[in-house]
Amino acid sequence: VLNFILKLLVLSWRIHFEKPLIQPAVIGLWHQDLPACLAAFKYKNIAVLISQSGDGSKFAKLAKSLGYDIFRGSSSKGQSEVKHLFKALISGRSAGMALDGPRGPALIAKPGARWLADKTETPLLNITVKYSHALRLNSWDKTFIPLPFAKITILINNETLDNWL
């Protein structure tokens, strides 16, 4: 039932890309923007690594229903789980990951995305999201939940991130 309600919410959002998505690429986003990015990049042949936590299980089920190729992993296991994303990039598909990982600190990039982009010689895209109307959760990452019929603007930058990672 929750997945059905979430899918209806996603369908109500008006999503606009400031510029086209380059593929294949490592798509780096902030954990706070996961709900909007999940909706924005649906059915675009993207592989994602999702935590094995309980929250990750719920998120993985929704992501799979939106056309994502899901791999479950743990940040405590290091890069062993990233091999699936590596293979996806080598085969010409994109890989998405939260730059600040599953536990944060929020908005502090970890090295995994940069490593993956360097090893596969694919661009690392920094995704920033703007919302017309959204709630913010009281969680470690202050997740944005766009309200019904919110306008979501996806900003794709492949220059800035290279300068600070």
Predicted segments with their positions:
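Membrane-anchoring hydrophobic helices of lipid-metabolizing enzymes
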Residues: 1-42, 68, 86-87, 147-151, ...
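A cross-family acyltransferase "interaction/gating" segment
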Residues: 16, 108-164
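Catalytic core of membrane glycerolipid acyltransferases/transacylases, capturing the structured
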Residues: 24-77, 120, 133-136
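Short, charged beta->alpha transition segments
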Residues: 59, 79-87
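Generic beta-sheet signal
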Residues: 73, 98, 126-129
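Catalytic-site beta-strand/loop segments enriched in glycine and acidic/polar residues
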Residues: 85-120
